[in-house]
Amino acid sequence: MEESVKRCRGFSDAREDLMSKLTDALISQVLFYLPTKEAVSTSVLSSRWKSVWLLIPDLDLNSSAFPSNNAFVGFIDKFIDFSKIENSCLHKLKLSIRKEHENDNKSCVTRWIGFVATHKLKHLDVECLLWKKKCLEVMPLTLYITQTLFYLRLHRVLLGNVESISLPCLKTMHLEQNVYANETCLEFFISSCPVLEDLSIVRKVDDNVKVLRVLSQTLTSLFVAFDYGEHRRGFHGYYSLDFGVLIDAPRLKYLKIGDDISRSKIVSNMDSLAKIEIVGLFYIERAFHNKVARNFFIGISRVRDMIISDRAMWFMSFYFLREESTPQFCNLSSLEVKISWSRGINLSMFLDNSPNLKSMVLVIYCKNLEKSVSFSSVPQCLLSSLEFVEIKISRFGIISLGIGIARFFVENSVVLKKLVVHSSRPMRKKSLVAFENLLALPRRSSMCQIISVVDAGSCGGENERCSLAADDAYLLEPSGR
């Protein structure tokens, strides 16, 4: 703050006089482009500047930037008092509040949000850090009837029961690690937003919501996940609990599921879904006669683009093994599989059900070679549609495993145009020999080009890419990837 004040005091008298002749509205527009802390520091320039910063339409306030809790509370209260007199023009507010004691900022945040939400607020971002349940900030009733709000992010707050919600302009909402009065409260909140398009929900094990229900006629993008926090070590025990997620969103185009332990996953009206990501931990009820898994996979079977973790792929493979009739992913054109554990997954089962796949990326993180990936047969897409394959090997992955997988595609893909082996670290002698053997293999496709890429920094220089095309022309060129 002192450096900012010195910088402001460094203005020449002529410059200060020139700026002071501008209207408050113009000065506030100039201050808008400064960080909030520096904009506030202009209040010491003169009596003319004392309150101009209060007209800024965008404030980003962090309680940690203040010398004490009382200073932070006093600052906000002063702003609100001025706004009541001057008719606040605040459009965007971000509050980052660190609560180390139960009485810190007690009820203040609720009061502040209750005030700004009644005006022309369009963008609200509230995050509370280092809290305990008894320290949770309760969102005021006025928040639920903010007529101008189009963006809302709430992080670690408490949302109670409300009888009426009116958010006619809200298009983007992020709800992260909050606690809710009950699951009906959350369902009502989501379904009462008539133009909501982008929704992300990060759940907590103890958020009072067992079954998350997302019912929306307007939603186009959805992200759902669990944050385990201190419970992560024991997350396996939560599989036995009745967590669930139900999604009914006919306009949904993009769905991302991350670290989700819900036994039940029900999706309906997914005809518009174009892309799905299933990352991290994954669980779904897989009892032999249970229809939950079948209905889930059928529900997402129309996607064109899929990114999936090996855990989710394992569940899918397990399901395909037990069912005579499995869903076909006929629209699937692009697939990325992240492999981070050694529990074997059989890709053939899934690829057999993806007859029109054109592009495939395998990202290898695991250290254990033991049957991480296997193929029980040559899938149909290798014989008719697959044109691009990339094997990405992280610095923790096994290069020889990646090359072994690449070998299968080179030997069996009829229309393959390019295969890339992408390593995050340089190849040692054993891996180089394996790659040279890969280059020497007879290729099922006459168009196939094999490329090796080593990341910049892993060998002391720029990325280098070596490729061998069908005519055996050997090239060495910088990587542009």
Curated annotation (Swiss-Prot):
Which residue ranges does the record assign to the FBD domain?
Answer: 370-423
| One Pfam family named in its UniProt record | F-box
Q: What is this protein called?
A: FBD-associated F-box protein At5g44490
Q: Which residues form the F-box domain?
A: 17-64
Q: Output the superkingdom of the source species.
A: Eukaryota
